[in-house]
């Protein structure tokens, strides 16, 4: 009595189909499926490692050269 049997779910499905119509339900199903597919594709893109060649080079600083300059400046003083 507490659980819902298959007959209860079939009756609920029939009522929903009558209220909304099968075309509207099909559109909702397509929208939901494409949203799930887009989410999965987005998760796959996030997991893929970025190629080092594709990363932009932006103002990298050579730390060793900077330290060498500081030590030569302190020797002059």
From Swiss-Prot:
InterPro entries registered for this protein in UniProt: TatA/B/E, TatA/E
Location relative to the cell: Cell inner membrane
Superkingdom of the organism of origin: Bacteria
GO molecular function (one): protein transmembrane transporter activity
Pfam families: TatA_B_E
Biased composition (Basic and acidic residues): 64-77
Biological processes per GO annotation: protein transport by the Tat complex
Region ranges (Disordered): 40-77
UniProt similarity note: Belongs to the TatA/E family.
Known partners and oligomeric status: The Tat system comprises two distinct complexes: a TatABC complex, containing multiple copies of TatA, TatB and TatC subunits, and a separate TatA complex, containing only TatA subunits. Substrates initially bind to the TatABC complex, which probably triggers association of the separate TatA complex to form the active translocon.
PANTHER family (UniProt xref): SEC-INDEPENDENT PROTEIN TRANSLOCASE PROTEIN TATA (PTHR42982:SF1)
Name under which the protein is recorded: Sec-independent protein translocase protein TatA
């Amino acid at each position: 009595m507490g659980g819902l049997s298959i007959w209860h779910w079939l009756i609920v499905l029939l009522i929903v189909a009558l209220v909304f119509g099968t075309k509207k339900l099909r559109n909702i199903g397509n929208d939901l499926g494409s949203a799930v597919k887009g989410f999965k594709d987005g998760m796959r893109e996030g997991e893929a490692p970025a190629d080092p060649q594709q990363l932009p080079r932006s103002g990298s600083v050579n730390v060793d050269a900077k330290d060498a300059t500081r030590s030569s400046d302190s020797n002059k003083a």
